[in-house]
UniProtKB/Swiss-Prot annotation:
Pfam families: CysS_C, DALR_2, tRNA-synt_1e. One of its GO terms (molecular function) is ATP binding. InterPro entries: Cys-tRNA-ligase, Cys-tRNA-synt_Ia_DALR, Cys-tRNA/MSH_ligase, CysS_C, Rossmann-like_a/b/a_fold, tRNA-synt_1_cat_dom, tRNAsynth_Ia_anticodon-bd. A motif ('KMSKS' region) lies at residues 326-330. It is an enzyme of class 6 (ligase). This is Cysteine--tRNA ligase. Its cofactor is Zn(2+). HAMAP family: Cys_tRNA_synth (MF_00041). Belongs to the class-I aminoacyl-tRNA synthetase family. The gene is cysS. Gene3D superfamilies: Cysteine-tRNA ligase, C-terminal anti-codon recognition domain, HUPs. Coiled coil: none annotated. The lineage of its organism: Bacteria, Bacillati, Actinomycetota, Actinomycetes, Bifidobacteriales. Keywords: Aminoacyl-tRNA synthetase, ATP-binding, Cytoplasm, Ligase, Metal-binding, Nucleotide-binding, Protein biosynthesis, Zinc.
Amino acid sequence: MGNSQEPQDFNISVMPSSLTPVHVAKAAEGLNLYDTASHQVSHFVPLKPGEVGIYVCGATVQSSPHIGHIRAAVAFDIVRRWFLKLGYKVTFVRNVTDIDDKILVKAAAAGQRWWARAYYYEREFTEAYNTLGVLPPTVEPRATGHMSDMIDLIQRILDNGHGYVVTDADGKPTGNVYFDVASWPHYGELTHQKQTSEVDEAAAVADRMGPSVDATGADKYNPVDPADASPDKHDPRDFALWKAPKDTDPEDARWSTPFGVGRPGWHIECSAMSHRYLGDGFDIHGGGLDLRFPHHENEMAQTCAAGYPSAARWMHSAWVTAKGEKMSKSLGTGLSVPSVLAEHSAWVVRYALGSVQYRSMLEWSDQALVEAQAAYDRVSNFIERAGVALGGQPSREEVAAVSADDLPADFVAAMNDDVNVSGATAAIFTAIRSGNTLLSQLADRADSETAKAEVREALLAVRAMLDTLGLDPLAEPWVSAGGAADGTAESPEHAALEALIAEQLNARAEARKAKDFAKADQIRDALTEAGIAIEDGPQGSTWSLK
């Protein structure tokens, strides 16, 4: 039988130190973020000056990660990076749900120990996060390491009169404990539901928010759980805080409690872990759009019913669609992370996943990946050319040290507008166009040192903006991955483009040598019309994507 234990089974990165000086940028005064509970974009003010606490619901590690999972991770990674660029100390908690009905069922079907399966897929998720440049969380707690926290929280809810223990004919606790929704008048505030005893009301709200399906087509967030369908419930809306074990549950998937042997309900896990690491109230609770109801609605209710304040702001990332429809069974494994990475570089996949504002649906298509590859080519081309012109690149330390106050105003305005990544990306490419213009003028400038300083300033700004989105090609993990960031490896598409343009430039050079300037101009005009800028210099002609 499992044992209630103190939280010891989790990963911790560097925790923010209270001794570290805080230098919040002036740009932070303009930050506005959406709040699901209020349905409004509002000015962000941290609960503690200079610090931000964020809890994001992580994966239920039952199977391999798919693009929908990682989209949410990338979205909140960008949110986190913007807070860091603004100068805040950020405590970022992302949990791992490693005990769950589906984990138990799938492990049994595969002849595996449930905990071994959970750990195996947890590592797959970690590998996907790392490969796609998602920063490791400050704390990554596993549900199984926090049973005592959950039991304590449930006891507080019971003591406050907002839950009930189911007993058998002899008056002994069965292990089933439910939250009493009728006792909590604030239930429904997150998703703006009316208090009603009709279960259809909650179902209707859930339906309006879209289907809760994963890549296998299964109902991931609202599974048919015998505990939640039990006739022992006082109200159809009541949900399980603790669940009695099924006959098929392994002995090591059961924990002893004052209200019987069993295992936790899904919602209580996040309430317990967020309170453990972020305390009484924190700034932001995030997760995928599917989690608004019932998970986050239930989580908010039980946390407050235990006597603790809820998160000050709730943020939800929209899901990934294909041909206008949310990922579903019909897409099979085509959207699994390994299958996508087998065909595209990690930088390109990250760019595609983070290419729109987090609340916007993300349409996943071949065209989106082609556009992401083109973006990479434009970015890497400028960075490489600028580095050659300057004789070197700004260091990673210098790039990371650029404050939000020193970034281009249009980029800051976009990021402060509820993390409008589309606008921020447009600002980056505006800066790249300006930088390419400076590079084209470099050879003709009499004030060469001033000209180089301007190029360097443009290069530093571009890389700092990219870094804020987790996309600086000269940062980890892109450099270690051997991507084209360092010029040592190119995508097949870029290599083909390079070869075709080189052939055209050679033909143009031959025409100029033969004084056939009409043909030379014709070649240049054709390349320009195709979006390729040609620049002639003492060492020959170079090209860049406009």
